[in-house]
Amino acid sequence: MNIRLNAKVISTIPVFIAVNIAAVGIWFFDISSQSMPLILGIIAGGLVDLDNRLTGRLKNVFFTLIAFSISSFIVQLHIGKPIQYIVLMTVLTFIFTMIGAVGQRYSTIAFGSLVVALYTTLTYIPEVNVWFINPVMILCGTLLYSVVTLIVYLFFPNRPVQESVAKAFCALGEYLDTKSCFFDPDEVAEIEKKHLNFAMKNANVVTAFNIVRTALFYRIRGQHRHPLTQRMLRYYFAAQDIHERANSTHFDYQQITEKLKNTDLIFRIQRLLELQAQSCKEITASLRENKPYHFNKRVERALLGTLHSFDLYRAQHLNDQDELIDIQTLLDNLQSINWQLRQLAQDTTVTEQLAQIHTEQITGLKNISAVIFSHFTFESPLFRHAVRLSIVVFLCCAIVEFFQFNLGYWILLTTVFVCQPNYSATKVRLRQRIIGTILGVVVGSLLPYLNPTLELKLGLVVLTSTLFFFFRSNNYSFSTFFITLQVLLSFDVMGFDTAAALMPRLLDTLLGAAISWFAVSYLWPDWKYLQLDKVSHQALRSDAVYLLHIISQLQFGKSDDLKYRIARRNAHQYAAALSTTLSNMNNEPVKYKAYLQKGFDLLKLNYSLLSYISALGAYRDRMKNLQQTAQFLSGFYPVAKKIIYTLEHIEEIPEAIFNQQQESIETHLKELEKQEMTAEERAVFSLPYQQLNLITQLLPQFYGYFKKEINCQSAGAL
């Protein structure tokens, strides 16, 4: 079905239809007094809506209803018993938060169950004789949303995964745009500063790839694979290859740009990268608009012009063979990117052998329990967040029960939605929540002047609920504004005095926000558990594993198997984790002043290492078709394995042994470069030698960084 609707619009269709049905039911059966739990049940269902194939969605609905039933009924039975209720909510908060250790899907349903417990409390009316009516109405709302979303899925089965692929190519386009800045001849002196921005863009690409991988994993588990899923799988593999090619570095950008700055070649390389970035964005547009992608011939002409310019440059610089090989390798990678972009415009299918997606999936009660208990340490951010949030929930419940605040559990609702695992995210969410609530209260105070009918109120409930979901993922202030209006309208529909709810809503939000800020600032704050050294160790080890897989495949022949892609993904994920850690630290420059500069130096260092390794990875295609000489086999692989060993154990090696190992590696590489080779052999084998040389030059800098870390820790212990 070629219906061209924005993915965000499609994602809000289920809540729009479900709330419309609920509104008609409330009006027809005259059950205004139960409107709020029914609507909140729909919202809770939307909060845990997870993309999956049809059978996976049915399983999600089944487990969601079970989790919501347990949460809602057990809370309903303890409302009115202050001590029991406070203890119950505290325990539920800790358990539901820790379940997040198992994976994103468990985390989403667990958080939804906690929200349902709060919704059950907020909609509790002591005067109602039927004790189970609130949980039943919440579950009816969730079931209604689930049925509607399954029907909508049948009309748009692949749009979520298509949108995730579109976002990946959008991130890839921005990445290539940033890469092109390295070939700006007028900004040679600024190249060093651009590495940080490039690393951040790389982290965005990795995040987008992870979302695509998870979406595809759940789509290709079944026997039948939709043709569009196969197409998205092909796009995903192409994006990965483009990323590896673009991430490859064969030279010092500053040196090569300085040499080329008075030629047209550097301008052509920059323009080619910009056009390739534009092609990625055109792929994004074609996926979002559900149109075929057409390869832009300008990109091909730009490539041919660049190759012609290089031929002229080579004819004038025949003595600079090393430099020519570097540029030729860069152009080979740009040609490969062009090929990937061109073949995406053609109707081909990915082979079954390549169609393997790996994602972490924990199954079995024993494994799930083991994973959860492995986080029972204050070194785990999840455990700190679970304990912190549990204390906050306990405090909020105690305040409400002790002071008997009217509608006081809005304090608790605010803290649960605002309190995030780290300080920076909480601070942003706090500001957005307060702004949205204030605007909502101001606009809500004007509603009584409209003197709306029940039909108009229900229509506004539909509108505000839909807009809440539309803005939920990209503008939390707007979503808070619309949910505040929705709550005030629901109070009016139920027959309560809306004016009496305005100030409690505002004051409770402010109090909840203050408690959340205090919690993340003083209860096991991030700065006390700085993970920079840990993340840097993980990043370096994953780089070593990535290099090991590349060397193995160079030695025994390329096979783009699952293990290689997992190693590559892990290296990029830990690089992204390092980037994210520094980004969070940079948001609090006063607290992390002592760590920031060396952290950014390490980030650039790790990114250089990863780009040098990626260049070898991209070279596997050529090596597969070459006859490796005995001279190359006996020289290259032993020294490569020494480098891998050094990377894996760099923080453990004594200084004297490291210096000896470094000298041995450098000596071997110099001997290899002096070996007699034909011009053809030099053109083929010089790049692997060169990449090992580049990696070797980084080893002393890595060793110096980790040596300082060890010395600092020893001094701290004394």
From Swiss-Prot:
It is a multi-pass membrane protein. The chain crosses the membrane at residues 9-29, 60-80, 83-103, 136-156, 391-411, 506-526. It is found in: Cell membrane. This is Uncharacterized protein HI_1680. InterPro entries: Integral_membrane_YccS, Integral_membrane_YCCS_YHJK, Memb_transporter_dom, YccS_N. One of its GO terms (cellular component) is plasma membrane. Belongs to the YccS/YhfK family.
